[in-house]
């Protein structure tokens, strides 16, 4: 197995860090998977050769030497045998047909299972086309109704949603489940016989299995968040209750592809496997691919002889059996099962959402195999399809729950890391750099590890389990020598990464993550070997007993796993690498070529930059928001921290009849909300004032004045926490949608006792879209509003399955998750639960995407028995839909512009690199002092250009949080670069440049962001040059320095720059762009506005002043002095 090592050439902050580590991790995972394909193919070859020669297969030894390469054609042959094995299990029969003609192109040799009678044997009396053979029309083998069902399934867009199809043989009337799926050459029909007394023979029985699954899903959804272990324990209990298997396990795949049993329920006399770890080769990559295609796989009897599949000679390769449940297992898997005393098994895939970067799209590519739910039994038996489907349904629900749990876990981990980083930064200010190792929390608390160390200035500070000081120094020297061009290395095996001293570290230190913080200093995190955390969960052996390592068995798998991971640690997660990178960036910026006291001064300065409030900008935004709220067509109201109304727009005043003036200052809960809504609104208020914003909450408001005749105004609102400029919550704003008319009709409809058809079929626009389900989840009602919303008529959908045929077929849904969620909601409602405001979206007949809120209520007959459900759609108003569509179009345009910008950035970089290379060649020649200055000016202009192209996070700049570089620079070099950028325009217009810059200013050494101040001054100068009248015009640059003493021998220089020119000055709209955040009238105005924001990040400011005959930019900014001696020359 290849080492999980990563190098980092350079890092950027935030999302760039995460993207970099994710891409690296994705590449590593793919490489690991490809290496495992090689191992799997070789193991299969060894197993098959041992069988042919009569020798026993030494499983443990084969795994340990599995890393020898095999030819590519051998891997291809291996995959073909797994996916196109040409054998099935004898519990069912398989037919493959051409999809359009239904002509048989392949069939299994156990066709006698179909009881075809006289047709099964060719004879003179019967025409040849009636015999089950290649070319037979499969429809002739079944009853007319069965043939019609198969034809109906064949034209379905998503054929799997039509399963199972009940079919009967034409002669014997023997019933079968027909499970159909498409392959490259046609359609495969898996036929499984229905046994007498099978509880699932009727539609009611199939629905009952769904109800059992829904009950199990409800249990999962009721579990407390944040406990994946409890979730897995509950799943194995539910699956055992559904299937009755002797043993049910949850088997989780780790990042390095090995597996672990994380939950188990079993018969008391069976040996436990809980906690057992398996090597990655125990479940080959080819098998994992099969699980993604066919998520439930069953072995009825591992001892049964497989049945051969006969196929047409026209087919170019063996029939693909990936999607067929009867597909026979390979001999090695059957032998493994037999060795562990299991006869039949049921394996179900647990699929979760994969990484966006990894997936790169939708569909299966964006999904990831998280693990398996594995069932074993000691006697043979087939599980009927409806029960398998119910289990698959449960697995889909488990995948959804796991997605939420894993997201929550990632958020909690990230919060912990951010909190630790904040504390580490605080320590850095008080005691740099030793505070991050001598105080608590320390760097060891940043990520999960066994030890950590700081190597700084040739000295070591060590925490926990680490190498010795001499070994750490040796590792640092090795990194500098062999990985000198990278800023960090992370690996789960120092031995595999090539560190020559790995053997001397023993098992205590196997994995390492390092981050270089200066040219020769490092942070280290260490992990011990994985095997120390692994414990065998089985029965203890007598000392005299010995395991047979050659047999394929869980114990030999575990032994082989321990050999594989003996010198390997747990891999480093993406979020851990991101945390290390972030801390590395902070320290690299802080410790770059400066002493400790300089470090602290600079860090304080940098933090001050990031604490800008931008109160004037927030005020302008607030004014604009007030105007939008007052004129909005949606009802909007707001309350202060005490629940008193301080916002009441015209729309809510119109609906309630209460004028704005009277509403202000009233208590929302006590004066304006109906009693039945009080508890809901109080809870929403309480949560919002704590920062927890709720959505789609129903609020009933009282009516006044002209609206008094209405009982109430019913709003569905979203709560938004209102914050002041210091980010403290000061109130709550509610943005709502008026649903009064729909709610009144819906309530009457639900409560009605007699004939409801007059309401369902009413064309009244106030009637919401309504459809109904019978107890089998088939559509029994579809009103005119539903026809309008979906484009499908009543007659086209009545009697069809709501899941699959209507939603999923007629009205397409976005992905399998949407199908699963809708199925759960529908069955929960048919089980008696009421569903409120479930977000639901689909594509109508014309392909338009429709978003709605679904409310579902149970239907009962006179005896109170549940007979189905009523479902209501709440569709957003046309105005809101239009606004959303406009937003989507704007997002498309923005994305197109981003692509253009990315193209331009890339194409500019190439010639820029050429210029940089040419300059470096010039630097190596013999240059005069003036020529050296020209080359230096060119270099700083190149750096400015590079920085502008790299700084794409304008949103952070808008919010006042862009990160600034802090380094020593010479002010004279900056001024030369600024002037050089204006020289071409200056000469073209024949303008005179006047520079009034004191000599001490040119040589002044400062700390700050050299490139940013250069960009700001150059932008102001270029705009002045554009609007200076010519000829005989002039432009003057003046600099006035003032020294400030901070104490402790530290000095700050206040710099005043004046860029002056004669004439009328810059156009008024351009000056307005400089100071107006909301919009820009000109392209130049965008640059001016951004430069002003950059200046404010530096605690500076700019004004544009018009005086008689002249105008000028007045720029004020402060920088720390780099050397105290300079202070003596400044007054």
Swiss-Prot record:
Residues 621-692, 755-826 form the PAS domain. It comes from the Eukaryota. This is Phytochrome. Residues 1-30 are annotated as: Disordered. It holds the Pfam family PAS_2. One of its GO terms (biological process) is red, far-red light phototransduction. Keywords: Chromophore, Photoreceptor protein, Receptor, Repeat, Sensory transduction, Transcription, Transcription regulation. Residues 9-29 have a biased composition (Low complexity). GO terms for molecular function: phosphorelay sensor kinase activity; photoreceptor activity; protein homodimerization activity. SUPFAM superfamilies: ATPase domain of HSP90 chaperone/DNA topoisomerase II/histidine kinase (SSF55874), GAF domain-like (SSF55781), PYP-like sensor domain (PAS domain) (SSF55785). Contains one covalently linked phytochromobilin chromophore. Belongs to the phytochrome family. Regulatory photoreceptor which exists in two forms that are reversibly interconvertible by light: the Pr form that absorbs maximally in the red region of the spectrum and the Pfr form that absorbs maximally in the far-red region. Photoconversion of Pr to Pfr induces an array of morphogenic responses, whereas reconversion of Pfr to Pr cancels the induction of those responses. Pfr controls the expression of a number of nuclear genes including those encoding the small subunit of ribulose-bisphosphate carboxylase, chlorophyll A/B binding protein, protochlorophyllide reductase, rRNA, etc. Residues 227-406 form the GAF domain. InterPro entries: GAF, GAF-like_dom_sf, HATPase_C_sf, His_kinase_dom, HisK_dim/P_dom, PAS, PAS-like_dom_sf, PAS_2. The keyword Transcription applies. Residues 903-1123 form the Histidine kinase domain. NCBIfam families: sensory_box (TIGR00229). Phytochromobilin binds at residue 332. The keyword ATP-binding does not apply. Homodimer.
């Amino acid at each position: 197995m290849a080492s999980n090592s990563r190098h980092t050439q350079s890092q950027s902050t935030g999302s760039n860090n995460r993207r970099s580590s994710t891409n690296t991790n994705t590449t590593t995972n793919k490489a690991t998977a490809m290496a495992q394909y090689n191992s799997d193919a070789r193991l299969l070859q060894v197993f098959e050769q041992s069988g042919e020669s009569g020798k026993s297969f030494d499983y443990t030894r084969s795994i340990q030497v599995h890393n020898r390469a095999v030819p590519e054609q051998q891997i291809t042959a291996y995959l073909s045998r797994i996916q196109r094995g040409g054998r099935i299990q004898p519990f069912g029969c398989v037919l493959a047909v051409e999809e359009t003609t239904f002509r048989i192109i392949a069939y299994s040799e156990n066709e006698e299972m179909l009881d075809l009678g006289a047709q099964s044997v060719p004879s003179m009396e019967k025409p040849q086309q009636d015999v089950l053979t290649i070319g037979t029309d499969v429809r002739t083998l079944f009853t007319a109704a069965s043939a019609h069902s198969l034809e109906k399934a064949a034209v379905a867009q998503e054929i799997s949603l039509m399963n199972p199809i009940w079919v009967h043989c034409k002669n014997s009337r023997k019933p079968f489940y027909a499970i159909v799926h498409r392959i490259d050459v046609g359609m495969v029909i898996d036929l499984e016989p229905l046994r007498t007394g099978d509880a699932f023979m009727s539609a009611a029985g199939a629905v009952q299995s769904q109800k059992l699954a829904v009950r199990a899903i409800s249990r999962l959804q009721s579990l407390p968040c944040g406990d994946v272990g409890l979730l897995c324990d509950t799943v194995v209990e539910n699956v055992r209750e559904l299937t009755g298997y002797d043993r049910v396990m949850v088997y989780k795949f780790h990042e390095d592809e090995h597996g672990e049993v994380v939950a188990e329920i079993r018969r008391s006399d069976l040996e436990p496997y809980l906690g057992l770890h398996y090597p990655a080769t125990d479940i080959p990559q080819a098998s994992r691919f099969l699980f993604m295609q066919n998520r439930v796989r069953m072995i009825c009897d591992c001892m049964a002889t497989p049945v051969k599949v006969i196929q047409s000679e026209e087919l170019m390769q063996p029939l693909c059996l990936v999607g067929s449940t009867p597909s026979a297992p390979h001999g090695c898997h059957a032998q493994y099962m037999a060795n562990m005393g299991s006869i039949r098994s049921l394996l179900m895939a647990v699929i979760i959402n994969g990484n966006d970067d990894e997936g790169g799209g939708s569909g299966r590519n964006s999904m990831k195999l998280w693990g398996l739910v594995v069932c074993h039994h000691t006697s043979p038996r087939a599980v009927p399809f409806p029960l398998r489907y119910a289990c698959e349904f449960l697995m889909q629900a488990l995948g959804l729950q796991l997605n939420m749990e894993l997201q929550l876990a990632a958020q909690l981990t990230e919060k912990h890391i951010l909190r630790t980083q904040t504390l580490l930064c605080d320590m850095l200010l008080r005691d740099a750099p030793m505070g991050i190792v001598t105080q608590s929390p320390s760097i060891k608390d940043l990520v999960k590890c066994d030890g950590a160390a700081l190597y700084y200035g040739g000295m070591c500070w060590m925490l926990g389990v680490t190498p010795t000081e001499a070994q750490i120094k040796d590792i640092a020297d090795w990194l500098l020598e062999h990985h000198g061009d990278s800023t960090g290395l992370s690996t789960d095996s120092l031995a595999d990464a090539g560190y020559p001293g790995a053997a001397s570290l023993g098992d205590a230190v196997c994995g390492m993550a390092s981050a270089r913080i200066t040219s020769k200093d490092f942070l280290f995190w260490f992990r011990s070997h994985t095997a120390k955390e692994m414990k065998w969960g089985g029965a203890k052996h007598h000392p005299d007993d010995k395991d047979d390592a050659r047999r394929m068995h869980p114990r030999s798998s575990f032994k082989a796993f321990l050999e594989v991971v003996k010198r390997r640690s747990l891999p480093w997660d993406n979020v851990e690498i991101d945390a290390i990178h972030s801390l590395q960036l902070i320290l690299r910026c802080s410790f770059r070529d400066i002493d400790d006291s300089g470090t602290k001064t600079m860090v304080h300065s940098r933090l001050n930059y990031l604490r800008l409030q931008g109160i004037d900008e927030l005020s302008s935004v607030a004014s604009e928001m007030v105007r939008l709220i007052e004129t909005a067509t949606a009802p909007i109201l707001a309350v202060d921290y005490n629940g008193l109304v301080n916002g009441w727009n015209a729309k809510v005043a119109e609906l309630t009849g209460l004028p704005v003036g009277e509403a202000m200052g009233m208590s929302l809960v006590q004066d304006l909300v109906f009693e039945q809504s009080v508890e809901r609104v109080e809870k929403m208020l309480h949560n919002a004032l704590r920062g927890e914003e709720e959505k789609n909450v129903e609020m009933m408001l009282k009516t006044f004045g002209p609206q008094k005749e209405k009982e109430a105004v019913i709003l569905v609102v979203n709560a938004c926490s209102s914050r002041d400029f210091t980010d403290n919550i000061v109130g709550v704003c509610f943005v709502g949608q008026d649903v009064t008319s729909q709610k009144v009709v819906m309530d009457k409809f639900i409560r009605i006792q007699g004939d409801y058809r007059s309401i369902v079929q009413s064309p009244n626009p106030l009637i919401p879209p309504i459809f109904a389900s019978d107890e089998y989840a088939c559509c029994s009602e579809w009103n005119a509003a539903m026809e309008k919303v979906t484009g499908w008529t009543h007659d086209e959908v009545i009697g069809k399955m709501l899941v699959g045929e209507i939603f999923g077929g007629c009205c397409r849904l976005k992905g399998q998750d949407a199908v699963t969620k809708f199925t759960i909601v529908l069955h929960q409602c048919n089980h008696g639960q009421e569903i409120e405001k479930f977000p639901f979206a689909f594509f109508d007949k014309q392909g338009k995407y429709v978003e709605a809120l679904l409310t579902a209520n149970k239907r009962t007959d006179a005896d109170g028995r549940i007979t189905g459900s009523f479902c209501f759609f709440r569709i957003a108003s046309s105005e809101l839909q239009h606004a959303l569509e406009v937003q989507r179009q704007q997002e498309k345009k923005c994305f197109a512009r981003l692509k253009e910008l990315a193209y331009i950035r890339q194409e500019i970089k190439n010639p820029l690199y050429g210029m940089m290379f040419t300059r470096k060649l010039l630097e190596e020649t013999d240059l005069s002092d003036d020529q050296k200055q020209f080359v230096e000016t060119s270099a700083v202009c190149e750096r400015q250009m590079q920085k502008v192209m790299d700084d794409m996070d304008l949103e952070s700049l808008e919010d006042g949080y862009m990160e600034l570089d802090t380094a020593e620079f010479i002010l004279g070099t900056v001024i030369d670069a600024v002037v050089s950028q204006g020289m071409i325009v200056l000469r073209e217009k024949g303008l005179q440049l006047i520079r009034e810059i004191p000599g001490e200013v040119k040589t002044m050494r400062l700390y700050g962001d050299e490139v940013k101040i250069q960009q700001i001054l150059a932008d102001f100068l270029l705009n002045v040059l554009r609007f200076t009248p010519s000829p005989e015009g002039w432009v003057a640059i003046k600099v006035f320095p003032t020294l400030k003493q901070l104490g402790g021998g530290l000095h700050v220089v206040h710099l005043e720059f004046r860029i002056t020119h004669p004439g009328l000055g810059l156009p008024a709209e351009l000056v307005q762009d400089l100071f107006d955040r909301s919009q820009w009238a000109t392209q130049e105005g965008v640059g001016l506005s951004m430069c002003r924001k950059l200046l404010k990040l530096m605690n500076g400011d700019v004004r544009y002043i018009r005086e008689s005959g002249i105008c000028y930019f007045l720029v004020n900014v402060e920088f720390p002095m780099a050397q105290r001696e300079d202070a003596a020359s400044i007054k």
